[in-house]
From Swiss-Prot:
This is Secretion system apparatus protein SsaQ. GO terms for biological process: bacterial-type flagellum-dependent swarming motility; positive chemotaxis; protein secretion by the type III secretion system. It comes from Salmonella typhimurium (strain LT2 / SGSC1412 / ATCC 700720). Belongs to the FliN/MopA/SpaO family. One of its GO terms (cellular component) is bacterial-type flagellum basal body. PANTHER family: FLAGELLAR MOTOR SWITCH PROTEIN FLIM, SECRETION SYSTEM APPARATUS PROTEIN SSAQ. Keywords: Protein transport, Transport. One of its GO terms (molecular function) is cytoskeletal motor activity. It holds the Pfam family FliMN_C. It comes from the Bacteria. Part of a type III secretion system.
């Protein structure tokens, strides 16, 4: 699946699949081909952001106006005026300004990245852009609230489900002792380098799946609860049922979410082991750590040979000071 930045994840749910046209701008979530572009600095309420324009768009715009796209051969004030004219629809819609003291630079976009793509036209020249380093509220000012009519285009939207890379068991005492920077070893649901993960379907059903590069998902195993799925992997700690145990020593199932997958709801009604379905979605830049479906932290997935661990970058559990 594709990767996506945290600040762009809400737009996957807000924007229709085919995108939305708002004023002179067309917005859509899509993977843009890896290529060179030109990066401009904008100012939105004293916050700086970056607008990436595909190199072909910028080159055609400059050559159509002054016969060259060579920045070193263009007077800086003239270059600023050309850029401001080309970016005018975006700047006007967002109430941002182009920074004159920050000259444009060359920059390539990222591979396998799902990003918010913004398109507009000036004097029959088409511009394709991606926003880097978003100022707070910048795109909210562009989009505002999408109309109810647009949201009703899809009466049965895809089902979005969490994708888990692995799990571990930790007692309440162990969870309480975790601090930022520490590493937690995880048991994977399969070889994640090959695309093996687990997902949680509606109704509390879990599945072990294989994700492929051509955006399909094969269902290798379907179970009614997460404990059954965990038991088929690494051995879980079990009590002998006779000795007493303190509450703080009871192991908790910790799941590590690495992204979200979307499936058509109609395809899930007769789902069985071995089925292969088309899938959308994206991987998150950080691992989300869950206990009983509650988020308790975030971290970075790190490979250690054939083993994997998550280094804690955010931790939300409060220590008991009583």
């Amino acid at each position: 699946m594709l990767r996506i930045a945290n600040e762009e994840r809400p737009w996957v749910e807000i924007l229709p699949t085919q995108g939305a046209t708002i004023g002179e701008l067309t917005l859509s979530m899509q993977q843009y081909p890896v290529q060179q572009g030109t990066l401009f600095t904008i100012n939105y309420h004293n916050e700086l952001g970056r607008v990436w324009i595909a190199e072909q768009c910028w080159q055609r715009w400059c050559e159509g106006l002054i016969g060259t796209a060579n920045r070193s051969a263009i007077d800086p004030e003239l270059l600023y005026g050309i850029a401001e004219w080309g970016l005018a629809p975006l700047l006007q819609a967002s109430d941002a300004t182009l920074c004159q003291n920050e000259p444009p630079t060359s920059c390539s976009n990222l591979p396998h990245q799902l990003a918010l793509h913004i398109k507009w036209t000036v004097e029959e020249h088409e511009f394709h852009s991606i926003i880097f380093t978003w100022p707070t509220g910048f795109l909210r000012n562009i989009v505002g609230e999408l109309s109810a009519e647009r949201q009703q285009i899809y009466p049965a939207p895809p089902v979005v489900v969490p994708v888990y890379s692995g799990w571990c068991q930790l007692t309440l005492i162990e969870l309480e002792s975790i601090e930022i920077g520490m590493g937690v070893r995880i048991h994977c649901f399969g070889d994640i380098r090959l695309g093996f993960f687990a997902i949680q379907l509606p109704g509390g059903i879990y599945a072990r799946v294989l994700l492929t590069e051509d955006n399909t998902m094969k269902f290798d195993e379907l179970v009614q609860d997460i404990e059954t799925l965990l038991a088929s992997g690494s051995p879980m700690s079990k009590s002998d049922g006779t000795s007493s145990v303190e509450l703080e020593q009871i192991p908790q199932q910790v799941l590590f979410e690495v992204g979200r997958a979307s499936l058509e709801i109609g395809q899930l009604r007769q789902l069985k082991t071995g089925d292969v379905l088309p899938v959308g979605g994206c991987f998150a830049p950080e691992v989300t750590i869950r206990v009983n479906d509650r988020i308790i932290g975030q971290g970075e997935l790190i490979a250690c040979g054939n083993e994997f661990m998550v280094r804690i970058t955010r931790w939300y559990l409060c220590k008991n000071t009583a």
